[in-house]
């Protein structure tokens, strides 16, 4: 008996060990069962977790609180559109709350779309857990449609392909399980036989697709999500439409054949946009741009720590841009002539030549930053500074001296920490004194000389520079990496400034609405006065017409007794009087119509302003409020002969 128990326990342990080993083996890659050459392919791990994070985030809560049906109604969408949206909203919520969907999206999910002539194939792949039972899931699915379902099984090369027909919605669904993957396809949009062929090596898998592998290899090695789009497979019609718009810019869709987006979550969430490049479809100017080498960004030391938006680029070719602009202007002779005349006037006034004096001293780097938007003056005034790399500082200073010799307004000079600041003053409020100065090889132009001083302080002491900000370190923007373009946004602060700006717009629009109400009252009063004048003039016209009629009748009987000239003179005077009255009445009516049109314009403007205020309060404000939960964002761009990479970093 004892040996029997030991034997049973041994078998039980072996079974448990086998199950554990089976559960630990690597799952089958999704790319191993899908065919190659999809038009679109998207994959996401931990789908439920990521969606819940978005839903329960402050941004998600604020967006969810927006009353979208009311927004659509206020913005004059049709009743059908509003009802369709509400129906879609309810269906989406019901689907997401469905336990079946939650279980299917618990791990990994993918969707692939294939183009076949004028039709498309769609496959959905989900990774199943060890405890998932297909029969149970599909019975729940059948119950969910509450219309009954008819199932049938098909054998294909040793694999069972299941087909389910749902009677109520008139839909069909096919599915096949291969190891831990469940592949589903609408009956009308997918042939699961192809999945079996790929798995059994009779067809080329997605994992062997060179375009897909290009995107995957340039993405994050252990990404949670990946999007792949093959533009070469888009219909000729859409490619023709896009090419017709891009050709004037020197592009063709064939120049950017594949797109991808790789996603990796973390304390700093990372998104990398990958664009494949095919330079044989680019103009020489565009190829020259993509041949620009990446640079180590040395301009962060110019930026004060209180900057809320910063951007820099290291591949600007001003000579090429000047040449391109002249070519474009040649297509519009009238505009080209006026701009050329204005340019010549500037060159004569300042005794310089744009092509020979200005362009040669400009470098390839340009950028700037924003610290605030001042709302205290009559209009919002951005606290903005722009910097530019200079090839020859001595020539640049000599050129700017020509501007100071022939100023268009009074130019002041101040020295701050051994740096000369030149500035002018504007009657727009405090600190509206734009100016310029040099720091190293950079020319700085600012909307306020206070910003120039802040840049000088940052340049001399990194403690005052944005380099000391945690976001710069976490985004690795100061590690000596080479980029083509960099942008940093302190999203929370920028969102608060944007809300302040919306508040200013709200006050401005409220003032316009009040003015429209006053104008309407004035217009109503003027129209009433004109109605009274028109009534009086009309009464005078009736009397004058009666007198004229009587005079004409009586003149026939009295003509032998009266002087004909006297009678005719009276008739002419009275005729002129009636004509003048008619002209006056017509003019008053035109004035009334002008006032009505003006009032209609005021009313239309007020209605538009009210709608703008509503959209700001009920759409933009919640979105901006939600963005306060995002501390900072950064965008970096790198490119080479074959690939353009844009990385989005979110903290």
Indicate residue ranges for each PLM-predicted region.
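A short, solvent-exposed beta-edge/loop patch
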Residues: 162-198, 424-460
């Amino acid at each position: 008996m004892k040996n029997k128990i030991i034997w049973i326990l041994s078998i039980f342990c072996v079974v448990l060990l086998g199950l554990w080993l089976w559960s630990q083996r690597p799952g089958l890659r999704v790319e191993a069962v899908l065919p190659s050459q999809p038009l679109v392919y998207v994959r996401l791990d931990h789908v439920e977790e990521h969606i819940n994070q978005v839903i329960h985030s402050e941004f998600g809560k604020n967006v969810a609180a927006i009353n979208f049906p009311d927004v659509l109604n206020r913005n004059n969408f049709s009743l059908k559109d509003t009802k369709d949206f509400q129906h879609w909203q309810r269906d989406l919520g019901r689907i997401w709350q469905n336990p079946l969907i939650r279980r299917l999206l618990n791990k990994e999910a993918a969707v692939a779309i294939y183009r076949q002539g004028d039709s498309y194939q769609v496959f959905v792949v989900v990774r199943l857990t060890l405890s998932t039972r297909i029969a149970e899931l599909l019975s729940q699915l059948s119950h969910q449609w509450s219309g009954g379902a008819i199932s049938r099984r098909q054998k294909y090369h040793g694999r069972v392909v299941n087909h389910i027909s749902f009677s109520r919605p008139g839909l069909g669904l096919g599915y096949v399980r291969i190891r831990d993957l469940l592949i589903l396809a609408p009956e009308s949009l997918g042939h699961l036989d192809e999945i079996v062929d790929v798995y059994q090596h009779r067809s080329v898998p997605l994992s062997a697709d060179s375009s897909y592998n290009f995107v995957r290899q340039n993405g994050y090695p252990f990404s949670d999500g990946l999007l792949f789009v093959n533009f070469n497979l888009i219909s000729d019609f859409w490619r023709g439409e896009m090419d017709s718009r891009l050709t004037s810019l020197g592009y063709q869709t064939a120049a950017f054949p594949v797109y991808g987006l790789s996603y990796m979550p973390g304390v700093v969430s990372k998104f990398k946009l990958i664009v494949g490049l095919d330079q044989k479809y680019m103009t020489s100017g565009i190829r020259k741009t993509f041949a620009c080498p990446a640079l180590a960004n040395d301009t962060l030391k110019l930026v004060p720590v209180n900057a809320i938006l910063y951007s820099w680029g290291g591949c600007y070719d001003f000579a090429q841009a000047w040449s391109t602009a002249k070519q474009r202007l040649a297509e519009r002779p009238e505009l080209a002539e006026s701009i050329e005349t204005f340019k010549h006037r500037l060159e004569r006034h300042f005794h310089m030549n744009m092509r020979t004096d200005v362009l040669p001293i400009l470098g390839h780097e340009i950028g700037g930053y924003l610290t605030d938007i001042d709302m205290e003056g009559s209009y919002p005034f951005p606290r903005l500074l722009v910097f530019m790399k200079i090839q020859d500082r001595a020539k640049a200073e000599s050129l700017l001296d020509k501007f100071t010799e022939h100023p268009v307004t009074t130019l002041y000079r101040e020295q701050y920490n051994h740096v000369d600041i030149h500035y002018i003053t504007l009657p727009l409020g405090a600190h509206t004194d734009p100016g310029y100065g040099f720091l190293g090889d950079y020319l700085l132009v600012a909307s306020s000389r206070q910003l120039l001083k802040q840049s000088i302080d940052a340049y001399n002491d990194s403690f005052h520079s944005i380099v000391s900000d945690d976001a710069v370190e976490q985004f690795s923007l100061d590690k000596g990496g080479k980029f083509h373009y960099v942008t940093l946004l302190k999203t929370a602060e920028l969102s608060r400034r944007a809300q302040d700006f919306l508040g200013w717009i709200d006050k401005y629009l409220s003032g316009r609405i009040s003015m429209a109400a006053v104008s309407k009252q004035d217009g109503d009063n003027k129209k009433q006065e004109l109605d009274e004048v028109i009534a009086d003039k009309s009464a005078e016209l009736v009397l004058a017409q009666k007198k004229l009629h009587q005079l004409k009748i009586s003149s026939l009987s009295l003509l032998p007794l009266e002087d004909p000239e006297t009678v005719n003179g009276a008739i002419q005077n009275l005729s002129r009087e009636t004509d003048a009255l008619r002209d006056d009445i017509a003019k008053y009516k035109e004035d009334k119509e002008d006032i009505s049109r003006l009032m209609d314009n005021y009313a239309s403007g007020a209605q538009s302003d009210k709608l703008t205020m509503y959209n700001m309060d009920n759409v933009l404000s919640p979105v901006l409020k939600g963005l306060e939960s995002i501390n900072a964002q950064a965008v970096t761009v790198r490119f080479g002969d074959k690939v353009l990479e844009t990385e989005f970093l979110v903290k």
